[in-house]
Structures are given as C-alpha cells and as structure tokens.
C-alpha cells in the first residue's frame, strides 16, 4: 500500500503541466514575459494524412511594453518549436473584445479540424510551404484568462 501511494505521489510530482508562465526576465534567453505550452505536433504528408505525433513547444510572445502596435514588437505572436528544432512564428490578431485568434486568408491557412487538432498551412518569405497539425490549446487558454 505504501509503495503504490509513494509511486503515485512521485508520478504526480514528475508530471509536466501543460502551461507554464514565465515573468519578464525569468530566463536568460528571453527578456519579456511569456507563456509556454507543452503540446503535440505532427507533420502532414503530401496526401493529407498526418504522420506520428511528436512533442512541440508553443510560446505566446506578448507585445513589449510601450511598443507601437504597428511594429512587430507591439504585436502578439505564437511561436511553435518542433522537436527537430524547426520553428515558426505566427502573428496573432485581436478583435474589438481583445480576444486573440490566428489570421485567416492569404497564402496561409489555419483551420480547426474538429477533433482537437488544428491544421496549419504556412508559407515563409521564400515561398516554402509547411503543413502540420497541433493539438495546441494556447488561444483558448489566453482568451479564457484575459
């Protein structure tokens, strides 16, 4: 009985939380505050079928204080880091009620799949396309806790 209780306590202590808040200056590599989500991502094959899931980190990078919203430093971003060290940054848009969402239209497409996953179709400045899915919940979390 004591062993199983100890094992359960140790497992609970080692379980990683989905969201981590980091205040400004709390890390060596990022000066502003940010929110990190431990999520799953999977690449999508040319036939539209997803590959195996792999861990990924999703960051919400808020605007820097006193930065103009017309500049990159004055906007909200989501940065997705894949397990192979690739990363993408996606600017977010805010509506009149200050609810954040992914942009739609243009060369990029971001669509909820209705099964807890979101499909991202992105193109970088060079025209290289990237298609992947993620089970990120960061926008729901941010909009619920604003």
Predicted regions located by residue number:
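Sec-dependent signal peptide recognition
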Residues: 1-7
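Cysteine-centric segments in proteins
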Residues: 17-146
């Amino acid at each position: 009985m004591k062993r199983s209780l100890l094992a359960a306590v140790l497992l609970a202590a080692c379980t990683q939380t989905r969201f981590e808040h980091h205040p400004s200056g709390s890390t060596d590599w990022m000066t502003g505050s940010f929110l990190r989500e431990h999520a799953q991502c999977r690449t999508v094959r040319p036939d539209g079928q997803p590959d195996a899931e792999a861990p990924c980190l999703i960051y919400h990078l808020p605007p820097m204080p006193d930065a103009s919203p017309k500049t990159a430093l004055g906007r909200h971003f989501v940065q997705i880091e894949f397990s192979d060290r690739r990363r993408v940054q996606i600017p977010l848009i805010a509506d009149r009620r200050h609810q954040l969402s992914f942009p739609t239209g243009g060369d990029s497409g971001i669509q909820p799949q209705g099964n807890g996953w979101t499909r991202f179709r992105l193109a970088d400045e060079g025209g290289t396309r990237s298609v992947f899915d993620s089970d990120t919940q960061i926008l729901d979390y941010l909009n619920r806790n604003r």
